[in-house]
Amino acid sequence: MNLDIPLGSKSNYIEQNSLLRWIKYRTLSTLHYIDFQLRKDENELRMAFDTKNPFENSPDWQELEKIPAAGQIDRGLLTMHNGLRVLPTAYYGYGHGKLMQRSLGIHEPQEERLFHDILACIPANSTMMELGSYWAYYSLWFHKAVPQARNIMVEPRLSNLNYGQEHFRLNGFTGEFVLAGIGKDVKQDGELRIAGIDELMHELSVEKLAILHSDIQGYELEMLQSADKAIKDRAIDFFFISTHSDDIHQDCKSHLIESGYHILDDYRIAESWTPDGLIVAQSPELDRINLKPAVKKI
């Protein structure tokens, strides 16, 4: 049972039909539970049935403030640590949903603590672009924290893009959603558009991005190469780049340093509490902030 339907699938009409999506979202936890029982994936079984919070020993998890309702499900929605409400299993299914209940609505403790601290530096009327936005969690957080925020979500999978749209609706927010993949070579790959950062910023009339957040599964360096003009013009204040191999991590870090950006913090996959590494970088046009580093997992 595949609930996350790729673009071009014969079943894609579900994602294009508002009534069918409404039915899907209201039965999603049940559907994901059936999928979980049928697949019996070992990693998801561990996430679902473990009784411990996997992040309880992370100092960054401990530092993040959690509202009293964090991790609880109320009227079919999961409350995250900061009060945002999401579909409980939209982020990678039943196992992750159970994990986020135990972790009190935190799914990436190091990155979330860094993101929280950077948000304190973002002025009103700022714009964020999230690449590989999926459930749009970081965009939701930005929109909640920054007055008069503008949010742009870019995601290549229609079902994932729709999760983000539903989460914005559930939280009473509005945003701009773009169905596209990211690459340095602008093209049409079958039914999927491949776009670059410079192209998207021009197309969407974005003069400045306060945050560009990227989680695009191995295309990180291509993303930076597609932002050549924006980087030269210092049109991006902060980068949050999830990295998916040590080689890509080092290539991206070197590219940013060579472009004059300051690396505020970074950690590799082996140092992370989750499967991704991270690079946080700041434009040299800004006064360099004193960002407390994430605590690396030993």
In which residue ranges do the predicted regions lie?
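Hydrophobic packing residues within well-ordered alpha-helices of enzyme cores
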Residues: 115, 142, 164, 168, ...
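Conserved acidic-Pro-Pro-aromatic motif
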Residues: 149-153, 199-298
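Cofactor-binding loops of NAD(P)H-dependent oxidoreductases
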Residues: 93, 180, 214
